[in-house]
């Protein structure tokens, strides 16, 4: 029985990658398209003046984007994690692994995850567990990678679509609180592409969580991935569940939103999406599907070159926004229009204040 469970988990990991890559072949418009930064025609800064340094988990990181959680737990995904770790090392950005449950249940799969530390010994690496994982096992996940931080992914929509997924969730908050108290490294609670509302973020802040990843809709769709894995595809009505990355970021502009650190991910396409998310308060911006898609289609070297180009393009965008660093960028005025403005208005966000901030 154990062997069958292990094979099922490994197959699921490989299917997640294959279906995720397929999704990224045809992308919908960015959920940040209705956000427009108000720039300048007479910049105060030169490109060389721009400082892209950000602070996450109490540490300075030279660039405000990272490789988000995606994979691990099979022979095939070991190779992918190794390549992602090489990219993270060369570009000098943080990296998260996918859920480590497979390795916690089958020690022969540990190397499919800790390969990232072997290849990137000095980088910022994030471990990853579900709130289903007991504390002692979660501590093993951290130790497995010598991780700098721990992602706890919350994914009820994905679990419900997954035939073998969890059906009990009421203990999650208590478990997360235990992690906050007992983890030797910082905790970040992340969605998996369904987005967090400000109410969810407040619930987490109230138990001591200091960082969340809003992880909105618009990128890899795990409801669709799990539905595609089902023979009956019985959950096709749930494929649009959740709030987008743009909506989640706008929601955090509400006057009652908790004042905790947040990251943004989900459907990030390019440096323009990155700067918009940073301007809306994110401390860093994560990508998973697009990086794996680039890795699969173009290889490690081309993906590194693309991300290095993004750094230079991002500096140029900061010049246009008249911001020397992320702190200044977060005071840059921006216009929210279209459907996103309608949504923000219904959520009682002061869009006029955003448009005229200084």
From Swiss-Prot:
Primary location class: cytoplasm
Signal peptide: none
Cellular component aspect of the GO annotation: cytoplasm
Binding locations of FMN: 69-71, 99, 128, 190, 220, 267-269, 288-289
Stored PANTHER family: ISOPENTENYL-DIPHOSPHATE DELTA-ISOMERASE (PTHR43665:SF1)
Summary of subunit composition and partner proteins: Homooctamer. Dimer of tetramers.
Listed name of the protein: Isopentenyl-diphosphate delta-isomerase
Underlying gene: fni
């Amino acid at each position: 029985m154990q062997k069958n469970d292990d094979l099922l988990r490994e197959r699921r990991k490989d299917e997640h990658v294959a279906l995720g890559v397929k999704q990224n072949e045809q992308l919908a418009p960015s959920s940040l398209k209705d956000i427009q930064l108000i720039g300048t025609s007479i910049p105060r800064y030169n490109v060389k003046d721009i400082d892209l340094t950000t602070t996450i988990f109490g540490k300075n990181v030279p660039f405000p984007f990272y490789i988000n959680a995606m994979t691990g737990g099979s022979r095939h995904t070991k190779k992918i994690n190794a390549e992602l770790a090489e990219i993270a090392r060369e570009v000098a950005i943080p990296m998260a692994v996918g859920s480590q449950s497979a390795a916690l249940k089958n020690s022969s799969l540990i190397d499919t995850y800790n390969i990232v530390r072997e290849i990137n010994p000095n980088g910022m690496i994030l471990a990853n567990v579900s709130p289903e994982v007991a504390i002692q096992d979660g501590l093993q996940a951290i130790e497995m990678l010598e991780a700098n931080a721990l992602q706890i992914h919350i994914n009820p929509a994905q679990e419900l679509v997954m035939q073998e997924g969890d059906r009990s969730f009421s203990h999650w908050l208590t478990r997360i609180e235990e992690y906050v108290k007992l983890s030797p490294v910082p905790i970040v609670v992340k969605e998996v592409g369904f987005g967090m509302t400000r109410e969810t973020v407040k619930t987490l802040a109230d138990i001591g969580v200091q960082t969340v990843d809003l992880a909105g809709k618009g990128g890899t769709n795990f409801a669709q991935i799990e539905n595609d894995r089902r023979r009956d595809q019985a959950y096709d009505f749930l494929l649009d569940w959740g709030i987008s990355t743009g909506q989640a970021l706008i929601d955090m502009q509400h006057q009652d939103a908790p004042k905790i650190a947040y990251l943004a991910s989900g459907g990030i396409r390019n440096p323009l999406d990155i700067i918009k998310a940073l301007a809306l308060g994110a401390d860093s911006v994560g990508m998973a599907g697009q990086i794996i898609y680039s890795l699969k289609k173009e290889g490690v070297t081309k993906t590194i070159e693309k991300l290095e180009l993004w750094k230079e393009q991002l500096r140029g965008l900061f010049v246009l926004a008249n911001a020397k660093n992320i702190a200044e960028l977060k005071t840059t005025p921006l216009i929210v229009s279209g459907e996103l403005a309608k949504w923000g208005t219904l959520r009682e966000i002061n869009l006029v204040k955003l448009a005229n901030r200084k």
